[in-house]
Amino acid sequence: MLPEQFCVRMKEMLGEEYAAFYASYDLPKYQALRINPLKTERDTFLLQAPFSLNRVPWTTNGYYYSGNDQPGRHPYHEAGVYYIQEPSAMAPAEYLMAEPGERILDLCAAPGGKSTQIACSMQGEGLIVCNEIHPARAKILSENIERMGVCNALVTNETPQKLSDNFREYFDRILVDAPCSGEGMFRKNEDACDEWSPENVENCAARQAEILDCAAEMLKPGGRLVYSTCTFAPTENEGSISRFLERHPEFELLPAEKKDGMMPGVPAWTDHPAEGLEHTIRLWPHHLKGEGHYLAVLQKAGVLSRTCQGYCRNGVEKGISEKECKEFFAFAEENLVKNITGNFLKFGDQLYRMPEGMPSIRNLKVLRPGLHLGTLKKNRFEPSHALALALRPDQVKHVCSLESDSPQVKAYLNGQTLNMDGEKGWYLVTVDGYSIGWGKLAGGILKNHYPKGLRKNG
């Protein structure tokens, strides 16, 4: 049951369109996945996908799937071949237009759909900082970064204010997918209905202002800022943007192409509308196949320069010498076709390869400072699950190849050992050629190293 005050407001906003908007809540929700180009070519996946797929028109790799399909239960999901994501939510990252080699911030990043979408555009080059203020959600974010094979992410659990104190005019692009009243989630999540109130809308708008002000400080001159919400409330959309532009005249709204059913923002829905509000975008559930979203593309005055370093409070993270992680290099020589190079960082006995030019993480709450390589133990190295998911079969010397419909895949994901012949040592386990985890072979038995917390029962 939709909140009465919400319905009254939407009727005032939409007029003759309200009936179609209201009727959209009786339709089945649209479900989609986004193919991960860090793991597979789109055309390759479409040929082998065991699902009925239809293109999401506003994103390169997004596809609707049938309600009868269950891609979340397929081994490809565990291998990070795709990310299950609400179709409307795929739009904001497209408009960020991320490029390889840039510094990018996803300021409110959990659960990770938009971060991993941005990372795909970066192709492993540059730095993406993925931040989430809530610890439990930050953990989920970090797990999704791992599953999708992202190597150049710094995952933090900080307030926007703390980040803005550390980074001034540092990022080329910033996405603010702001916490909101979640009106676009009503069909998907009944709790969103129960938690809604006009007071919550106002509280969200106030919080959005604080977040946007922090983002403004962290963006380089000439940089791009994309703001998005999954709500319909003008106070949180056209209103939040108009008030932001009043406070920050150094920003302007950029025209953004409206694709396949997208509609413009409406200046009349807010007091003192900013110039160019019609350039912002609304995704309505009665105009397209999605739950609904709002987004605005803004640019900061100035000329964007990759050579502009910006301000980073504690400089660049120094890392450690190769001598301090000699166990890893011994493992790599024995098991990898080509050594992994870069700058390395130790967290206790955990070893990471940092993204190039990663800033100092001193005084920051960090969950993942780059690619987790594994654990340094006395005279040996144990590779991480993240490393398995970041590697391709042609990058390792030993592979255990399984087919997605085989009982061995189910057994492996359940944590069981597998019988196989071969040289003893570490094996990258794959499903239809996609990396899914590690096993260690000795005496014809492949010991299972799939993480206990991810294992499927039954």
Task: Show where each model-derived region lies.
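S-adenosyl-L-methionine
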Residues: N131-E169
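Mobile active-site "lid"/loop adjacent to the S-adenosyl-L-methionine
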Residues: A136, R173-D213, C230-N237, P264-W269
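Conserved SAM-binding loop of SAM-dependent methyltransferases across substrates and taxa
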Residues: P111-G124
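Helix-to-beta-strand junctions that scaffold the AdoMet/dcAdoMet cofactor pocket
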Residues: Q123, L219-P221
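Class I S-adenosyl-L-methionine
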Residues: F171, R224-Y227, F232-Y352, G357
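Conserved class I S-adenosyl-L-methionine
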Residues: G101-A110
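Polybasic, low-complexity RNA-engagement segments
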Residues: M1-M13, E17-L46, E291-H293, A301-G458
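Conserved AdoMet
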Residues: R34-M90
